[in-house]
Amino acid sequence: MKKYSSLVVILLLFFNTIVKADDIRDFEIEGMSIGDSLLDFFSEQTIKKNTKDYYGYKKDFSFIAIEIENHKSLKKYYGVQLHVKKNDKNYILYGINGYNYCKIDINNCYKQTEEIEKDFLRIFKKFDVRRANFKHSADPSKKSNVKATYFDFDNGDMISINVYDWGKKIGYTDNFDISIDANEFVKAFKNK
């Protein structure tokens, strides 16, 4: 009987891990997860000071971006871009993006993102993977390239890993980012 109860405990732990591994809310960027309140991480003054109108061109778009760079609480990423609903006084997170610059060698960015992708493939179980290489639409010279990997979950949530190899004329620094986005933000972004 003791053997069976041990087996049941092991099986329960195993299946619980699988279930957790397919919920992006269990994944963190700089300690933040989808569904968390930004107020648990930053003061309201910092949030308001760093609110950006990146989506003003999207009619009736219900989300705003907060971009925080080089903050003392950021340990792994140079900056984070956070998405919350407009007028939400609790600043509940629907999208989290962490990014770093590749100032010396973009190949380091490619290596880092390949390792992160391998980790995601080990951690998460139920998703479709899409990969794409394309020219960035912000660069009129068409010399800026993006290498992207998307993890699309059955419930509409998405994780993306991107490397931006910017053309010299646009003047941006090469960078990579990792985004975790809840279904509601993904749908709103695609539909507007």
Q: How should these model regions be labeled?
A:
Residues K2-S5, F41:
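Asparagine-rich low-complexity intrinsically disordered tracts
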Residues M1, V9, K89-N90:
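Short hydrophobic/aromatic-rich motifs at helix boundaries and adjacent loops
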Residues A21-A65, G95-K192:
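Non-cytosolic coordination micro-motifs
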Residues L12, H71-S73, N87-K89, P140-K142, ...:
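Sterically constrained small-residue positions within well-ordered secondary structures
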Residues E67-I92:
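Compositionally biased P/S/T/G-rich terminal and signal peptide-adjacent segments
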